[in-house]
Each structure stands twice: as structure tokens, then as C-alpha cells.
């Protein structure tokens, strides 16, 4: 009987959500040993019929790459790797097993929250996140307000939390969830919002930061993609805009900014996960942020949260030239990474995007830096590849807590170095 019930609920769940499943899909960790093997992997990536999803692209020999391989192609890919002498191991045995666990935990948490408080250590739907944002505003009207900066392609509101002690101050911008499947980022942003209101007036650091600067926080930058990743396809990364002349949907919003648009590290193929879109700012989610920042006129720091890899990066990504502010940004990032590490020992790699990961054009912090916002940083949160995008909910709180120390170090520097 119990088994029949489980099967029934499983079928029901799948039916309600028409969830795409990933039964038998594996994530392989691949270690290319030379340039030749990297070339082979890039050719493999280009084979569209294999439907490979590179979670972490092959960049330099000796550096790991991660790829999700659909069940039907697992054998073929392994045979190819072996024939080329490319070392690999299985990072995730069966992706669906992790997804089922994640789903189960969300359902369990939803039941628990009905009779209790909001649990910041769980993944939530967009609706639940919006509700909690409203609660924060209602509970701390003197410190937090909600600013609507636009609507997504599917007409969901893009709501920013504004933390301010009044007056027209210079500001810090912080966003998360520009890539839909990076769930730990939206969760971390929401925890951060709660942390700011809890600690203001108690923690001298955040108190003095907010006495000098406003903070604008956008917890879900890509709401359509987020909803889609929860209801249809957990691996979804892009927006949900319609691309004319293509059956494929969506644009990679972090290749859509007006910074080296259409250059290396972005794809002109609408079916690619890193498709840059028809033109810079074609995505309303990106354009809304650009318009808001331009009209505000006094944003001094632009920080974006991604996952995963444990990196803290600054510009440039679209070119590999050294910034004028390289020394200062490098120092700030090193300091932030040290603060972050002090809590749980989590190690972050620090440097410009181009050298830390790869050349990638059309990214948000390259645009913000070129626009004149000196303190532009991108975090890639936990982990380094045990779970990748499917970070278990039990790691949300430690991730958010340590990230907060890094964020605070950056904000303190911005506070002490007005320009």
C-alpha cells in the first residue's frame, strides 16, 4: 500500500508540475591534461545532439570541468573520453535522486512553515519569497521599503528592497538569481535582507554602513526563469523571452549587458544556454536594472551573486586587459575572501573574471564598471562541485552567513572610500 501511495504521489507531483525529469543523468567531473584534450572537450560540447549541459566549462589543463550528461548519452560520452585518454570521474551518480530529495524537502518545509516561522534555511517559491519581502517591509517600515523597478517578460514584478535611514544617499546595489537554477543565491539574498534589518542598530559595522549608504537588494533578478526552474525544468538558466525566428526560448541575462556585447564567451545560437540575445539590453530584466541605476545616479558599488565555484571576481570578463583600479579591487576582494573564510574555512579564489574563469562578454559587472561604478564584484557561492547547482538546503545558512562577512568587508571599504 505504502509503495502504491508513493507512486501515486510521484505521478501526481509530476503531473501537476509537468516536471522535466533527469532520471539516470550523470554529472561527470573531467580533468583535461593538455590543450589538445580541451579542444576535444570543446568539440564534444558543440555536438548539439548530445544535449550536454556544461556546468563548468573546460578552460585550462589540470582544471576540472563538470558536465551533465543525459542518461541516453552517458555511455557514448564515457567511451569518447576513454578513447581520448581524458580522465573523468562520476560527480553525481543520478541527478534525479538529488532533485527528488530537494522537492521532498521543499514540500516538508512548506508544511512546517504553515504552523511556524519563515525558514531561511530552505528553498522557496517566488510567491513565498515575495511574501517574506512584504513581511520584512511591514515589520521594519522605518528601514525597508519596496521599490518596483519593472516587470519581467512574463509580467512578474521586479521588486527591490531598499534599506535606508533616510536622505538621498549614495548606494550599494546587490542582486541575486540572474541565472535561474542558482537557487542558493536567491536564498542567500533573502537571508541577507533579514540580516540587515536584524543587525541594524546592534552591529556597529552595518549600522555605520547604512548611516552612510543606502542598500538596494534584488533577490530574484530573473523571476520567470526561477519559476520555470521550479515548475518545469530545474536546470533552466536563461530568461523566458521569445526569440523571433527560433523555437528555442530565453536569453542568458548575464551575456545581455552592454559590455563587449556579442563577444567571446557568449553564443549567437538561441538554443544555447549562453545565448546573448538579439541586442544588448534586449531582456527587460536587464534593461530595468540599467535604467534604475542610471536614473539613481549615485550607485557606488554593484555586487552580483551567482553559484557555484567559490570565486570572488571583478572586471573584466569581456576583455583580458588589466583595470586601472586593479590593485584596489584586488585588495578589497582578497580582504572579503579572508573574512568569508574566517567563519567555516570556505576557500574562495579571487581575481578578474577573464583570468579566474574565462573570457565572457556582456556580463553585468563589466557594464557597471564601465558605467563608472568602481566597486563592481561578482560572487560565485558554494560549492566547488560536489553538488554544483543542486546545493542541499542544509548548506543555505552557512553559505549565507559566510557570504555576509565577505559582503560586509566590501561595503565597509565602499563606506570608507567615497568617490
UniProtKB/Swiss-Prot annotation:
Its main location: secreted. One of its GO terms (molecular function) is carboxypeptidase activity. Its cofactor is Zn(2+). PROSITE patterns: CARBOXYPEPT_ZN_1, CARBOXYPEPT_ZN_2, PEPTIDASE_M14. GO terms for biological process: protein catabolic process in the vacuole; proteolysis. InterPro entries: CPA_M14_CPD, M14A-like_propep, M14A_act_pep, Peptidase_M14. The active site is at 380 (proton donor/acceptor). Residues 1-18 form the signal peptide. Residues 19-114 form a propeptide. Its EC number is 3.4.17.15. It catalyses: Similar to that of carboxypeptidase A (EC 3.4.17.1), but with a preference for bulkier C-terminal residues. Substrate binds at residues 179-182, 237, 254-255, 307-308, 358. Residues 122-414 form the Peptidase M14 domain. Binds 1 zinc ion per subunit. Disulfide bonds join 248-271, 320-354. Keywords: Carboxypeptidase, Disulfide bond, Hydrolase, Metal-binding, Metalloprotease, Protease, Secreted, Signal, Zinc, Zymogen. GO terms for cellular component: extracellular region; extracellular space; vacuole. It is found in: Secreted. Pfam families: Peptidase_M14 (PF00246), Propep_M14 (PF02244). Zn(2+) binds at residues 179, 182, 306. Carboxypeptidase that catalyzes the release of a C-terminal amino acid, with a preference for large aromatic C-terminal residues. Belongs to the peptidase M14 family. This is Carboxypeptidase A2. It comes from Homo sapiens.
Amino acid at each position: 500500500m505504502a509503495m502504491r501511495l508513493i507512486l501515486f504521489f510521484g505521478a501526481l507531483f509530476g503531473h501537476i508540475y509537468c516536471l522535466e525529469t533527469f532520471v539516470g543523468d550523470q554529472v561527470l567531473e573531467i580533468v583535461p591534461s593538455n590543450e589538445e584534450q580541451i579542444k576535444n572537450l570543446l568539440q564534444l560540447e558543440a555536438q548539439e545532439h548530445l544535449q550536454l549541459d556544461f556546468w563548468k566549462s573546460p578552460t585550462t589543463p589540470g582544471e576540472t570541468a563538470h558536465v551533465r550528461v543525459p542518461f541516453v548519452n552517458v555511455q557514448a560520452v564515457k567511451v569518447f573520453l576513454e578513447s581520448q585518454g581524458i580522465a573523468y570521474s562520476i560527480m553525481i551518480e543520478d541527478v534525479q535522486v538529488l532533485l527528488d530529495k530537494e522537492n521532498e524537502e521543499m514540500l516538508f518545509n512548506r508544511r512546517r512553515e504553515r504552523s511556524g516561522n519563515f525558514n531561511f534555511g530552505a528553498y522557496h517559491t517566488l510567491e513565498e519569497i515575495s511574501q517574506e519581502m512584504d513581511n520584512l517591509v511591514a515589520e521594519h517600515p522605518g528601514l525597508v521599503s519596496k521599490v518596483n523597478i519593472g516587470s519581467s517578460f512574463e509580467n512578474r514584478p521586479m521588486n527591490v528592497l531598499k534599506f535606508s535611514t533616510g536622505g538621498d544617499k549614495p548606494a550599494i546595489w546587490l542582486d541575486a538569481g540572474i541565472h535561474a537554477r542558482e537557487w542558493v543565491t536567491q536564498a542567500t539574498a533573502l537571508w541577507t535582507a533579514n540580516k540587515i534589518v536584524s543587525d541594524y542598530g546592534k552591529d556597529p559595522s552595518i549600522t555605520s554602513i547604512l548611516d552612510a549608504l543606502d542598500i538596494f537588494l534584488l533577490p530574484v533578478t530573473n523571476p520567470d526563469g526561477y519559476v520555470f526552474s521550479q515548475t518545469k525544468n530545474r536546470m533552466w538558466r536563461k530568461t523566458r523571452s521569445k526569440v523571433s525566428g527560433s523555437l528555442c526560448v530565453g536569453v542568458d541575462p548575464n551575456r545581455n549587458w552592454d559590455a563587449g556585447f556579442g563577444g567571446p564567451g557568449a553564443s549567437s545560437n538561441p538554443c544555447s544556454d549562453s545565448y546573448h540575445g538579439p541586442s544588448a539590453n534586449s531582456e527587460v530584466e536587464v534593461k530595468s536594472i540599467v535604467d534604475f541605476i542610471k536614473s539613481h545616479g549615485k550607485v557606488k558599488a554593484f555586487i552580483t551573486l551567482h553559484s557555484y565555484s567559490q570565486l570572488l571576481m571583478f572586471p573584466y570578463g569581456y576583455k583580458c586587459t588589466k583595470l586601472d583600479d586593479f590593485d584596489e579591487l584586488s585588495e578589497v576582494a582578497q580582504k572579503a575572501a579572508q573574512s568569508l573564510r574566517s567563519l567555516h574555512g570556505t576557500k574562495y579564489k579571487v581575481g578578474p573574471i577573464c583570468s579566474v574563469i574565462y573570457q565572457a562578454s556582456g556580463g553585468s559587472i563589466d557594464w557597471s564598471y564601465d558605467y563608472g561604478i568602481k566597486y563592481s564584484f561578482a560572487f560565485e557561492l558554494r560549492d566547488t562541485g560536489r553538488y554544483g547547482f543542486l546545493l542541499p538546503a542544509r548548506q543555505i545558512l552557512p553559505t549565507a552567513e559566510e557570504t555576509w562577512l565577505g559582503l560586509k568587508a566590501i561595503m565597509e571599504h565602499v563606506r570608507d572610500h567615497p568617490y
